[in-house]
């Protein structure tokens, strides 16, 4: 919040998402670490996931450290958000509908349920919030004109998962 004042308004609610995870035992395994739509290819025989090198700015030891697979799910959830936010030719409501359809289909396939997930499961919501906060900092430093994308996502997420 010090570097990006716009985060200050979300700090308490985001911390509540993280605090809800304290003491929980979460499954961990080797993960992709930088999973987003740009790391997928559609071939004749289906979808392929590429570039398992992890987050480029992390050390090799950090990239090899087991983590929750929900970190990769959160990365893809946020990737759908970026795709929707930058789509042209669609009304804002249609972009949001497309994003929610993609997120619910993807997460539903990951957890084998048809129930809407983001905003209802505090574990995944915390990982999505963590990714969105990272994106706010990234955009602030590198693409300030895009900072609204993760800020809007963070606003929607904390509105779903918490109350003041």
What are these regions (language model features)?
Residues 74-84:
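Metal-dependent nuclease catalytic cores in nucleic-acid-processing enzymes
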Residues 109-113:
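A structural motif corresponding to the C-terminal end of an alpha-helix
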Residues 37-38:
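Catalytic-loop Lys-Pro-X-Asn motif of eukaryotic-like protein kinases
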